[in-house]
Amino acid sequence: PSWGGKVTKPPRGKLFYIPQRPYMTLGSLRDQIIYPHTFEEMKRRGKTDADLFKYLDIVQLRLLVQQREKGLDSIEDWIDVLSGGEKQRIAMARLFYHHPQFAILDECTSAVSVDVEGSMYEYCRQVGITLFTVSHRKSLWSHHEYVFRFDGRGGSEFIIIEGTSDEFGS
């Protein structure tokens, strides 16, 4: 801490990280959403395909499933099949599935439209996922309460966001 206090790391399973280029595993579309869990782990957690469809609706990718004969069981080379924005939206559906207490989002919506991005961030707020976002997009400031800005010369400042967020760069 800069001026005092105690820094603690959340317990395993309470923190989730999504990079700008999310990992796509070999396997079904379902496997992409529940990664690194298996289908058996998904069932043990009490999750169903209906839950996955809910997450796909939030990230506006239900059509991706409907376009495939085998639906969630479709197996493709997802790293090549999905666009950059679709991969980022699958990663957000993955976040919703795992439902951690905290999430670090590292430019993870850079290829997603502002309206879909807003829906995803709003859902995180609704379900109580605390977000730490690394981004240059001005559109994201409205989804946060604080900014920790680095100046590129070793300095930083902690800012409470009040009202509009136009002052925080693009």
Regions found by a protein language model. Give the residues of each.
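ABC-family nucleotide-binding domains
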Residues: 106, 110-117
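Hydrophobic, well-ordered secondary-structure elements that form the walls
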Residues: 18, 29, 56, 92-93, ...
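Conserved post-Walker A segment of ABC ATPase nucleotide-binding domains
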Residues: 1-54, 118-128
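Conserved catalytic loops of ABC-family nucleotide-binding domains
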Residues: 123-143
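Conserved coupling/switch loop of ABC ATPases
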Residues: 20-21, 25-27, 57, 64, ...
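ABC-fold ATPase nucleotide-binding domain signature/coupling loops
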Residues: 25, 43-47, 52-90, 96-101, ...
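H-loop (His-switch) and adjacent beta-strand-loop-beta switch element
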Residues: 136-166
